[in-house]
Amino acid sequence: MPKLSKRLAGLASKIEDRVYEPLEAIALVKDNATAKFDETMEAHVRLGIDPKYTDQQLRTTVALPNGTGQTVRIAVVTRGEKVAEAKAAGAELAGDEDLVETIAKGEMEFDLLIATPDMMPKVAKLGRVLGPRGLMPNPKAGTVTIDLAGAIQEFKAGKLEFRADRTGIVHVRFGKASFTAEALLQNLKTLQETIDRNKPSGAKGRYWKSLYVTSTMGPSVEVDFSALQDIEQGS
């Protein structure tokens, strides 16, 4: 097994082998985020689902009330007047067949791809390039739409798409270490509510199995997800 760096081992030694209350866990991760940059806060949720079955797949979006603290580069595949509309709304890239050809070459200087419905037949051919990166537009995720301005505004403000991976784990960034613990807790609570609200119809047995929070360069801390579920938003 690879050895922990001295820095990470030192930080990990501060964490007790127990489950922490949500706010306590967040505060501990913040205290351990000592890198020379503003570390991203991440949540890792293990769910009792088997995504190989279609009725146990989870893919949706969450609008974090305090944003992510990250700049999202958006590309839009559309045509006609919609190209100018997308650029005016803040998209870094917007175009029609030319943009599709650029993406097909593997040139993807963006974090999110939005498409209008009329362009999806062309975008669908990019599955080999977009699929592995999780960038294929999807109506459920709000990335296939005619309301480009609204979608761009929402994703720029902190709306995130997420899905459970093949092992049933959800990985979501929910802010920066520079956020207050209270702001991070609000974001984490909103994520929990979204996961519960979108529970797959085929999920059986215990839905939540574990929840860990961590930062980019820090150790992970296990969170009492039941305590998180019991929190009333705004309390």
UniProtKB/Swiss-Prot annotation:
UniProt xrefs under Gene3D superfamilies: 3.30.190.20, 3.40.50.790
Q: Name one GO biological process term.
A: translation
Where does this protein have coiled-coil stretches? none
Superkingdom assignment: Bacteria
**InterPro entries recorded:** Ribosom_uL1_bac-type, Ribosomal_uL1, Ribosomal_uL1-like, Ribosomal_uL1/biogenesis, Ribosomal_uL1_3-a/b-sand, Ribosomal_uL1_CS
| One of the Pfam families matching this protein, by short name | Ribosomal_L1
Briefly, what is this protein's role?
Binds directly to 23S rRNA. The L1 stalk is quite mobile in the ribosome, and is involved in E site tRNA release. Protein L1 is also a translational repressor protein, it controls the translation of the L11 operon by binding to its mRNA.
Q: Which family does it belong to?
A: Belongs to the universal ribosomal protein uL1 family.
Gene Ontology MF annotations: rRNA binding; structural constituent of ribosome; tRNA binding
Protein name, entry field: Large ribosomal subunit protein uL1
Q: Does the keyword Transmembrane helix apply?
A: no
**Subunit notes for this chain?**
Part of the 50S ribosomal subunit.
**Among its keywords, does the record have Lipoprotein?**
no
Keywords (A to Z) from UniProt: Repressor, Ribonucleoprotein, Ribosomal protein, RNA-binding, rRNA-binding, Translation regulation, tRNA-binding
Tell me which GO cellular component terms the UniProt record holds.
large ribosomal subunit
